[in-house]
Structures are given as C-alpha cells and as structure tokens.
Swiss-Prot record:
Catalytic reaction list: prephenate + S-adenosyl-L-methionine = carboxy-S-adenosyl-L-methionine + 3-phenylpyruvate + H2O
Summary of subunit composition and partner proteins: Homodimer.
InterPro entries xref list: CmoA, Methyltransf_25, SAM-dependent_MTases_sf
GO molecular function, one term: S-adenosyl-L-methionine binding
Annotated EC: 2.1.3.-
Name of the protein in its database record: Carboxy-S-adenosyl-L-methionine synthase
Disulfide bond sites: none
Keyword Zinc: no
Gene: cmoA
Organism expressing this protein natively: Hydrogenovibrio crunogenus (strain DSM 25203 / XCL-2)
Protein residues bound to S-adenosyl-L-methionine: 48, 73-75, 140, 207
Gene3D superfamilies per UniProt: Vaccinia Virus protein VP39
Protein family per UniProt: Belongs to the class I-like SAM-binding methyltransferase superfamily. Cx-SAM synthase family.
Length: 251
C-alpha cells in the first residue's frame, strides 16, 4: 500500500468507475469516494502536489500569529496538514466539509500528526459558517461544487473576514472562452488521466457523474468575482492545463 508523503494518508487505487453501470449516478463524496480520494485526485488533477506545497509556502509567508486559518472544503485534510506545518504559534485552523465521511477520515489523519497548532473540524456548509479574524483562507477545488449563485456571496464574506494582509488561495478547474482552446487543453488533461491508468470507460463514466455537480468558471469570471469582493491584488499563481490556483491578497 502506498502512503502519501505529504499527508501520510494511505493511497488505495481508484476503481470506482472501472465497471460499467446501467445508469451513472451523480458524484457524491461518500464512503466509497473517501476510500480512494487521494489516488483519485493525484491521478486526475495535474499539479496537485505542487499546489499543496505552494499552500504551505504561502501560509508560512502570510499567516499571522493569533489569527484563524480556514480550509473550506477540506476533504481528507491534505491542505490542512500542509498549512499546519507552516502556521505560526497562536493560530488555529478551522477545516470545514459537508461530507461526514470526509470529516471522520480527516480527523483520523490529522490526529496522526503531532502539532501545537489546533485544528477544529466542522461538518458544515462553507457558505454558512462565519469567517472571522482570518489571515489565510484556502478553497482547494471545492467552490466549483457549490451553487454558482452562492459563490460571490461566499467570496464577499471571506474578504470581510480576512485581516489586512491576509490571503485567499482559490484552486479550481477552469474552462476557456475559446472553443478551440477548451478542446485542446481538455485533450491534454484527458491524456494525463490516460497516462495515469484510467480507461476510456472510467473517464466517460466519471465525466457523466460530474456533469451537473461540478460547474466550472472561466479565469475571467474568477478574477471578476475576486475584484468585486474587494481584492485589489489577485491572479493565477499556478496553472496546469485546465486546473488553476488563484492568489488574492487583502490590502
């Protein structure tokens, strides 16, 4: 069994869509997904480990003592653990996910690593929790799963809850306004999945399961939202194919 060197999480192979289904249901973060999630995301998202490393380095630079750090949509706690390694004394991390199986497994993983930085795990909707006294907020590939109409409101709340000098790290699958670019870059991402061992059946069934669940935005839409929230400095700091991570800094 492989173990992630970033999180210590056991990596079980993702075979959820390896067998044909008569009808593919909507993707859910249930027990079956939790069991294979580290393998799923590493084989599906190019640059994922680089983003985790960057989250740690940005936490080291921008996290403020006696402040709160948020991981909104924490899944198994990979970003939480990365942040905690770099967080200053006196800070605490609030990690939130709507999936109870994710929260339960995240608790096991986080408790497996000693740290003086406390982590508060919440099974809740990120759009409903208060953001207060924050110096770092991370949304790592989870904004795309909430209703588009709720996204601006959430970013507004995050901006208001950030301390001056605080940051938002927002990682998302993006789409392109140009149909030609969309086709070309999507081809590269599909080739990445094929190279990582996913079959055509797995790729097609996974895509069908996500069709009405993951709703992506363009780079321009993300940047416009961030600007509308009040961020004066915001841009992509990392991109691999159609996966991008934005950094927004509150003045």
């Amino acid at each position: 069994m492989l173990i992630s060197r970033y999180t210590g999480i056991p990596i079980l192979k993702d075979t959820l869509y390896a067998h044909p289904y008569e009808a593919v249901g909507e993707f859910q973060f249930d027990d079956s997904v939790v069991a294979v999630f580290p393998d799923m995301i590493q084989r599906s998202v190019p640059g994922y480990q680089t983003i985790l490393t960057g989250i740690g380095e940005l936490t080291a630079k921008y996290a403020q003592p006696n402040s709160q750090l948020y991981d909104l949509g924490c899944s198994l706690g990979a970003a939480t653990l990365t942040m905690r390694r770099k967080a200053p004394q006196g800070s605490q991390i609030i990690a939130v996910d709507t999936s109870q199986p994710m929260i339960e497994r995240a608790k096991e993983h986080i408790e497996g690593f000693h740290s003086d930085i406390p982590v508060r795990l919440l099974c809740d909707d990120m759009t409903q929790i208060p953001i207060e006294n924050a110096s770092v907020v991370v949304i790592n590939f989870t904004l795309q799963f909430i209703e588009p109409s709720a996204r601006q409101v959430l970013l507004d709340k995050i901006y208001q809850g950030l301390k001056p000098g605080g940051i938002l790290i927002l990682s998302e699958k993006i789409h392109f306004e140009s149909a030609e670019l969309q086709e070309a870059i999507e081809h590269l991402q599909l080739q990445f999945k094929r190279a990582n061992g996913y079959s055509e059946l797995e790729i097609s069934q996974k895509r069908a399961s996500l069709e009405n669940v993951l709703i992506s935005d363009s780079e321009a839409t993300h940047l416009n939202r961030l600007q509308q929230s009040g961020f004066k400095a915001a841009n992509i700091w990392f991109q691999a194919y159609n996966f991008a991570s934005f950094l927004a800094i509150k003045a």
